[in-house]
Amino acid sequence: MKHVFSVCLVIVALGVTAGAQAAAAGACEANGKPAKLNFTFNDLNNRKIALSDFKGKVIILDFWATWCVPCKAEIPGFIDLQKKYAGRGLQIVGLSVDDSLPTAKKYADAMKMNYPVLLAEGKEDILMAYDPIPSIPVSVVIGRDGKICSRHLGIASMDVFEKEIASLF
C-alpha cells in the first residue's frame, strides 16, 4: 500500500509540474512592463504611422533588417500569423532597423509582407525603449492592455508566438 501511495504521489507531482510548465509557456507575465508606444515612423509608402495607432490590439513588434538571415526565416511565419489572427485583433509590425526606404520596400514586396513595415533606421531611441536591442531579430509581444508579454532575442518558434498571443485574445 505504501508503494501504491508513493507512485500516486509521484504521478500527481509530475502532472502538476507539467501543467505549470505548459501554462508558463503559453501565458504572459502578470506584471509585464508597459510598452512604449509613443514612437512615430514612416511606413513603406512614406506615411507617418504611430505605434500608438495599434493600442487595443495584440501586437508583435519585430525588429529586423534585410541582410539578417534569421529575420528572413521568421517573416513567413509572421505572415501566416497575421493572416490567421488579424480578425481576432493581432497586429504584427515590422521595424526595419537599418534599411533605407527603397531597400526595405523592395524586400517587403518580394517577401509579400502583409503587415506594416516601419522604418526605424537611425532611431536608437526605439532600440533603447525595448531594453537595449543587442542584435536582431528581436520580437516583442504586447497585450491589448499595452503591457509587454514577452521579448524574444534571436529567432523564435512560431508555436511559441501562437501560444503567447492565444493567451492574450
Question: What are the roles of these predicted feature ranges?
Answer:
Residues 1-4:
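Positively charged n-region of N-terminal signal peptides that target proteins for export
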Residues 6-16:
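Bacterial N-terminal signal peptides
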Residues 21-52:
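N-terminal "domain-start" segment that seeds a small globular fold
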Residues 57-59, 63-67, 135:
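Short pre-active-site segment immediately N-terminal to redox-active cysteine/selenocysteine motifs
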Residues 63-80:
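Conserved redox-active cysteine motifs that mediate thiol-disulfide chemistry
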Residues 83-123:
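Conserved segment of the thioredoxin-like fold in thiol-based oxidoreductases
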Residues 107-114, 120-166:
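Thiol/disulfide oxidoreductase modules built on the thioredoxin-like
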